[in-house]
Amino acid sequence: FYFPEAILSYQTASHYDPEHPMPYWGLAHAMGPNPNSRYARMPDDPKGEGLKAINSALSRIQNATPIEAELIRALHVLYDKESISDDAKRDQAYLAAMRELNRRYPDHSDIAALYASAYMSIGRWDYWDSEGNPKAETMAVAEALEHIMATDLSNPGVLHLHIHLICLLYTSPSPRDWLQ
């Protein structure tokens, strides 16, 4: 979640393993939109470096595992302005791709975290309706994260994003439900 360090780490990884696609995927992920950048209305990929990185990952996709290839294709949707020019529609398409990956790989902690992040980028800290009830996808994301947490507490992304979901529990009509 510290993007400058993540970018430096992925750049270093791409130097040591230039033919593996995942360092480039990581660069694109770190350079791209995230819940905080969307909330602050920062421009997406203003210098085009994220697009360049995801295209580099795509050009090396033959070196990826099947799950890595699916993650690369999913993230490409977020950058593919030629196919979907509207930012909000691209966000929704990326969320749909991550929702599907989470459905297919419910025990994969990184996919659960990426699904949550995709949802939070769209929600921009708005996960509850005007009456304090969680929106439908808020519960689905919470359940995906909690499914992972039931057996594995080692993924910091899962834990971090779960905290963001429950930090707003005070607006819920039944906060005790979240504390169980």
Task: Locate each region found by the language model.
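Amphipathic alpha-helical repeat scaffolds of TPR domains
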Residues: P21-N34, A64-E82, H108-W128, L153-H164
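Active-site-surrounding "flap" and adjacent substrate/cofactor-binding loops of secreted or lumenal enzymes
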Residues: W25, H29-L58
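Short coil/turn connectors between adjacent alpha-helices in alpha-solenoid helical repeat scaffolds
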Residues: N36-P46, D80-R90, R124-E137, C167-L169
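A conserved position within tetratricopeptide repeats
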Residues: S14, L58-T65, R99-R103, M149-A150
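Conserved small/polar residues in nucleotide/adenosyl-binding loops
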Residues: Y170-P175
